[in-house]
């Protein structure tokens, strides 16, 4: 056991896996390739017996093309109730042969696909922010909100403790006619700070989450929710408000270089926004959509990561030791901060990105749909190593969905257990201490004699000091609780975080 308090499950619903399961066929079932609802209940009970809460992933922006309601929509006529569940529009051009707008999607050249691809005969187009197999729901239709409340209740009634809300900012869209073309709106990411943009982060979506919060609060204890909302930092607390979802991932650390000034700015800004909006900060260094943090820090900052992945990791060397050191130190840093911390699976092992997945085994649609110009996200999704050797490095008896490299064995749970200097044992100790040391969500910054060293304390005397780079730094007086690297002769090495009691 690592000492985690919550397990946030990856997507597990029935799916053709056009986008790793985020093309959902049925929101209230388990993919038969993975098990059954009875298996889910058994797992949930076992985790609860171990004192671990369980979160599940909810994908409210889109379904899959195999969802029964989308099949019904394709078979129905324009203007029908079935089509009103999705976003269908007539095309441009003399015969409707052009898509309604020139918007690209994340995974395809166009955000619109002609219904004929799935056998439709009405000459309309449907909208999808992501793959063509992921048609967007029409959240102006009350039937959609009612059905998602049904889904949330279905899982909460089974005992699920919380929900991760995928693409939480994208549900509501202004699709009033005439539809705007790309050059008349800021398309790529939300930039409107007032919540009045056209396609993302509209204030109306917060009203959806206020309704969800009422449902969550009807349970004892209330159900938790965390938004994956790629919005401007000043907008993030609106999703984390106690009136809406309650938490929102703060992604600022994910691409932040391991640097004292950058880290301090991220912390100060996030805590100030949370305080102003009566919400709580939520920290993370990685997720299933990002290159592993250890590899980011092991690569030189000027390296183009996309090109590096396309080269199968051969274009530039990775300093695996430095990368892992920085990853463990950064995780100890965020674990000491006020608020909630989410650790991406594998970070507790110091795992690096698997860059050399063979082309014929790549699963991420990003690769083919971007004409092989970006390798995608598979490298951080490779199944974890549990044993030094053996089939799948201990990850089950069947086949694994992505190939594991030979070097995985040295990062395995078996290889690290019992050695108190390994990332796994450091995490185990830190998570146990974190539970014991919880205090009011406040911190105080302390002066250091170097700009590349940060020192803060929590109200109960829990101190955290990080030496980001440069030479060794004198250890302040106090009892060392845990350190990401050994403190020898009272000196903190570079790339090290230490917790201590003053």
Regions found by a protein language model. Name each.
Residues 1-478, 482-502:
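Active-site and adjacent substrate-binding regions of carbohydrate-active enzymes
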């Amino acid at each position: 056991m690592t000492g985690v308090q919550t397990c946030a499950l990856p997507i597990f619903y029935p799916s053709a896996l056009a986008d790793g399961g985020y093309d959902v066929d049925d929101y209230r079932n388990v993919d038969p390739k993975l098990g059954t609802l009875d298996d889910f209940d058994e797992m949930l009970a076992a985790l609860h017996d171990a004192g671990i809460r369980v979160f599940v992933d909810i994908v409210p922006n889109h379904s899959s093309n195999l969802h029964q309601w989308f099949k019904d929509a394709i078979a129905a006529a324009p203007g029908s109730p079935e089509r009103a569940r999705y976003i269908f529009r007539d095309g441009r051009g003399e015969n409707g042969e052009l898509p309604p707008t020139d918007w690209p999607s994340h995974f395809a050249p166009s955000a619109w696909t002609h219904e004929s691809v799935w056998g439709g005969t009405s000459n309309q187009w449907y909208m999808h922010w992501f793959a063509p197999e992921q048609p967007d729901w029409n959240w102006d239709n009350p039937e959609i909100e009612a059905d998602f409340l049904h889904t949330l209740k279905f899982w909460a009634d089974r005992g699920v403790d919380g929900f991760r809300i995928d693409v939480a900012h994208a549900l509501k869209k202004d699709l009033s006619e005439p539809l705007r073309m790309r050059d008349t709106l800021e398309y790529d990411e939300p930039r409107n700070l007032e919540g009045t943009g056209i396609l993302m982060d509209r204030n109306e979506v917060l009203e959806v989450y206020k309704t969800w919060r009422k449902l969550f609060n009807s349970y004892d204890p209330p159900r938790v929710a965390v938004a994956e909302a790629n919005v401007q930092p000043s907008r993030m607390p609106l999703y984390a408000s106690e009136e809406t979802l309650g938490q929102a991932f703060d992604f600022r650390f994910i691409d932040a270089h391991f640097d004292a000034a950058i880290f301090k700015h991220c912390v100060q800004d996030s805590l100030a926004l949370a305080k102003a909006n009566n919400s709580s900060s939520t920290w993370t260094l990685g997720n299933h959509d990002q290159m592993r943090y250890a590899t980011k820090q092991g690569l030189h900052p000027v390296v183009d990561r996309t090109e590096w992945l396309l080269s199968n990791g051969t274009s530039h060397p990775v300093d695996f030791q430095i990368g892992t050191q920085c990853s463990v130190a950064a995780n100890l840093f965020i674990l000491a901060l006020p608020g909630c911390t989410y650790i991406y699976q594998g970070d507790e092992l110091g795992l690096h990105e698997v860059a050399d997945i063979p082309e014929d085994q790549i699963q991420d649609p990003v690769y083919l749909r971007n004409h092989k110009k970006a390798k995608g996200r598979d490298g951080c999704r490779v199944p974890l190593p549990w044993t030094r050797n053996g089939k799948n490095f201990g990850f089950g008896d069947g086949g694994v969905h992505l190939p594991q490299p030979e070097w995985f064995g040295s990062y395995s749970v078996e290889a690290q257990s019992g050695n108190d200097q390994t990332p796994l044992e450091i995490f185990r100790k830190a998570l146990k201490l974190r539970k014991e040391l919880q205090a009011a969500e406040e911190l105080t910054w302390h002066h250091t004699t170097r700009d590349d060293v940060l020192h803060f304390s929590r109200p109960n005397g829990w101190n955290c000091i990080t030496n980001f780079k440069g030479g060794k730094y004198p250890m302040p007086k106090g009892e060392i609780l845990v350190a990401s690297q050994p403190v020898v002769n009272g000196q903190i090495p570079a790339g090290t975080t230490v917790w201590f009691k003053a």
